[in-house]
Amino acid sequence: MAKTSKRYREIVQKIDRSQLYSLVDALALVKETAVAKFDESVDIAINLGIDVRKSDQVVRGSVVLPSGTGKSVRVAVFAQGDKAKEALDAGADIVGFEDLAERVKAGEINFDLAIASPDAMRVVGQLGQILGPRGLMPNPKVGTVTVDVINAIRNAKAGQVQFRADKAGIVHCTVGRASFDVEALRANIMALVDALNKSKPTTSKGVYLRKMAISSTMGVGVRVDHTAIV
């Protein structure tokens, strides 16, 4: 515990918590202070100027990060017939229909993302209480309910991430790994910011992107001067 506390103090001393850093400087600091023995994820938190109590101000979507996520993604596809064959050919790890639904009901959930063809939703709809709490329920708003299963699979494998504002109006997202260089992380963040701007509710008033902070898994949050990048 003493070693952990000492390490934490050393990290904190390198970061001025009252300062707003440029995106590049913030990323450099996050990389410098990510000293765990594993490749820490780099995470971002963005406060949005939305009223989460209003149904027309829900911010949700997906974006393919140009530098990827640094994580291998296992994709399950609910489809049958030609769509099932397309999914297999596109590199899906698991493909099935009612048989896959039964495996999920039995607790066999060995995938990171679920995609469904529209006709499969009559089967997938029964799995809401199982997949929903795990963030795995296919949804057309993030492109995981689609007739184009090939493109959905390719996007998932290429580093697509989903985002959604929480009850406090904050979007949390992993944008890479500490082993990524600064430019790769910057490109991923810019892609996310662009996607968030495109998802801005028309009824949102005032400043939309309000605050931004970046951290590694075991690190300390670094505040970013987001006004220079939005």
UniProtKB/Swiss-Prot annotation:
Keywords: Repressor, Ribonucleoprotein, Ribosomal protein, RNA-binding, rRNA-binding, Translation regulation, tRNA-binding. GO terms for molecular function: rRNA binding; structural constituent of ribosome; tRNA binding. PROSITE patterns: RIBOSOMAL_L1. The keyword rRNA-binding applies. Belongs to the universal ribosomal protein uL1 family. Part of the 50S ribosomal subunit. This is Large ribosomal subunit protein uL1. It comes from Nitrosomonas europaea (strain ATCC 19718 / CIP 103999 / KCTC 2705 / NBRC 14298).
